[in-house]
């Protein structure tokens, strides 16, 4: 097998940066994407240390940038695609801003679909054929026992439904899908009071992704491999 290739969105910090680091250590060719590479100091440092990391500009909320990326990597097989880019907008009862809600749906729910759809020819060319979207247990309808966080919860619930549909539509191409909860992680989004660090989360998620195949495709699980109800 030739050296596998992985594409990661939101690779400039947090989980995306750690995915980039650890997959490069696993000898993957890493296509690391983010909105403003020129400002991504830690990602640029990783790329200087490894010739396996290539950086591409990508704002997942702008379709033209997704199309531009697809042209740049037109003939590159993608073995694993990780939709990691996402945003958090605070919202409680009485404070859910409509514009913030629409923005969250655009980035958290629609953009992963757009990225997958546009890069589908590359994924079909890959050997491993795995599509992963980083979601949250907060998007689980079954698990919602505390309310609040209307914007984030609903945007991730929508992403979960997108991934359920994609599981059916991509299966004929032998493309396996995974909807993955990273845990509560100490990142800019998760905060420093979170339960685990990025190394623990991403190392666990990589093990789960390693085990992904067409037979167990379509699951919603966490970084430790634990099943989550939709």
Predicted features along the sequence, with ranges:
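Conserved Rossmann-fold cofactor-binding substructure of NAD(P)-dependent oxidoreductases
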Residues: 59-76
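Hydrophobic positions on the long internal alpha-helix
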Residues: 82, 115-119, 123, 162-163
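N-terminal Rossmann NAD(P)H-binding glycine-rich loop of SDR-like oxidoreductase domains
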Residues: 12, 16-21
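Conserved glycine-rich Rossmann-like NAD(P)H-binding loop of the short-chain dehydrogenase/reductase
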Residues: 24-42
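Catalytic loop of short-chain dehydrogenase/reductase
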Residues: 87-105, 124-171
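C-terminal helical subdomain
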Residues: 179-182, 191-230
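Rossmann-fold cofactor-recognition segment
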Residues: 47-64
């Amino acid at each position: 097998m030739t050296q596998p290739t992985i594409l990661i969105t939101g690779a400039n910090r947090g989980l995306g940066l750690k995915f980039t680091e650890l997959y490069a250590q696993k000898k993957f060719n890493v296509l690391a994407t983010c909105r403003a590479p020129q400002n991504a100091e830690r990602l640029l440092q990783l790329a200087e240390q490894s010739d396996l990391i290539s950086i591409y500009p990508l704002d997942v909320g702008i379709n033209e940038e997704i199309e531009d990326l697809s042209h740049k990597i037109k003939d590159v097989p993608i073995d694993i695609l990780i939709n990691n880019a996402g945003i958090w907008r605070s919202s409680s009862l009485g404070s859910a801003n409509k514009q913030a809600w629409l923005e969250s749906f655009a980035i958290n729910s629609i953009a992963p679909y757009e990225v997958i759809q546009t890069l589908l020819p590359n994924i079909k060319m890959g050997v491993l054929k795995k599509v992963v979207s980083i979601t949250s247990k907060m998007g689980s309808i079954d698990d919602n026992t505390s309310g609040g966080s209307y914007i984030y919860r609903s945007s991730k619930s929508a992403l979960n439904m997108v991934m359920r549909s994609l599981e059916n539509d991509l299966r004929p191409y032998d493309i396996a899908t995974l909807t993955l909860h990273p845990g509560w992680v100490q990142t800019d989004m998760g905060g420093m009071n979170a339960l685990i660090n990025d190394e623990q989360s991403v190392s666990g998620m990589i093990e789960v992704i390693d085990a992904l195949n067409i037979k167990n495709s379509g699951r919603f699980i966490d970084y430790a491999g634990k099943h989550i109800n939709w």
